[in-house]
Amino acid sequence: MTVDAAKPARRFSATTESGLALAIVVVLAVTALVDSNHSYWFRPQACATDIVRQTVMLGIFALGSAVVIISGGIDLSTGSMIAFSGTICATVMMVVDPAAMNTGQVGTATIVVAIAAALAVGLLVGSLHAWLITVVGLPAFVATLATLVGLRSLARAIVENVTAEFLGGRSTQIQIFDREFRYLGRTVWISAMLFILLAVLIGILMRYTVVGRHLYALGGNEQAARLSGIHTDRLKWLAYCLSAACASLAGVLAIGEQSVADPQTLGRGYELNAIAAAVVGGCSLQGGVGTVPGTVLGCLFLRAVIDGIAKIIKTGADVHEGWIVGIVVVMAVAFSQWRASGQRGKQFFTGALGSLAIVTLGLIAGTLVTLMADWRAGSATAAVTWVVLICAKIWENRVAVGQRAQGASGEATT
């Protein structure tokens, strides 16, 4: 990426970050006004602590995913890496001192060894990803999809065999009773400090070092970066190792917070949340664009939205988390692509495909509102959505006809 090209990119990132900051304020304000329990007013410290805890956990592994995305890759294995590293950490503690695992007195030395083992496994998995991509020649999507499936299955097998060996019976999870280790995962300020330190270090790496500039260049145009003398394979190795190491750290903190290593549920679906946070924060899935501050704000925005839904819906809010994240990601990517392309007059509902899209979007909107409220509200929402989108389609057609007429008159004049 040249200096001239970098300036518009920085302006674009700054605009994205400002918009995200404003969106976060709006989401928090709407939640405070709509929440019938007025949680933000009566329990501000507890609510803030909860949002910070969730944001920090998401942010730790989202930062690594953002580096991979900026470099032009993708890492789908983050959630499984969290489960695998957490399993390795708990397994090492059990193997080193099984008696202490049951009494809750593992000891600092054993904990340090277990955490080091989990981080080392992350670096090994990141190296495996880089090897599969750069040497074997697999697409990043395929390489990380394989480990997405494989790591979680391997973690489950490890837990069952270790518990059968040291506890006398097979189990699908490893319980952690050590107070010192649980304090590490449950104390918000420790996780927050680790997240801030990680964000600062990665931010310095990406913005102020040659390696960071080369990562942006790699994501912008890999062939041009290679021809200019940049060691692209080494950069991919760095990016995927960093992503896996961040996920490993998140896995260690997660089992400390939950007091259990359960590979069946730990980190499930987190890889999509990490990608969502990075994309919402301004990272382009095409590579070469994105910032650490934007990713941090993207994490905070996602968690604020999810927390707001939980406060407003009250019961069953976790059921709706997936589609909320999906809608936010689609809107963020579409808006980013629209701004980057500069096509202000783009038509979205042309032809039969546009008409089918209108029908589908109306049905989706109506279904979601029906699930959260009742069928009357859902029917009204679907009807309003159809009316609005049909009006948009008519407006697009009129604008297109006017543009064609202007073009024809201009040609006739010349």
Task: Annotate each language-model stretch with its function.
Residues 1-29, 33, 227-234, 305-414:
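Cytosolic-side transmembrane-helix boundaries in multi-pass membrane proteins
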Residues 21, 25-28, 55-58, 62, ...:
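Small-residue faces within membrane-embedded alpha-helices
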Residues 31-32, 44-101, 124, 131-138, ...:
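Single transmembrane alpha-helix segments in multi-pass membrane proteins
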Residues 67, 91, 96, 123-136, ...:
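Membrane-interface helix caps of multi-pass small-molecule transporters
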Residues 110-118, 125-129, 185-260, 385-414:
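Helix-loop-helix "hairpin" substructures at the membrane interface of multi-pass membrane proteins
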Residues 140-208, 258-267, 311-321, 334-352, ...:
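Transmembrane helix-bundle core of multi-pass membrane transporters
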Residues 247, 258, 262-329:
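Transmembrane alpha-helical segments in multi-pass inner-membrane proteins
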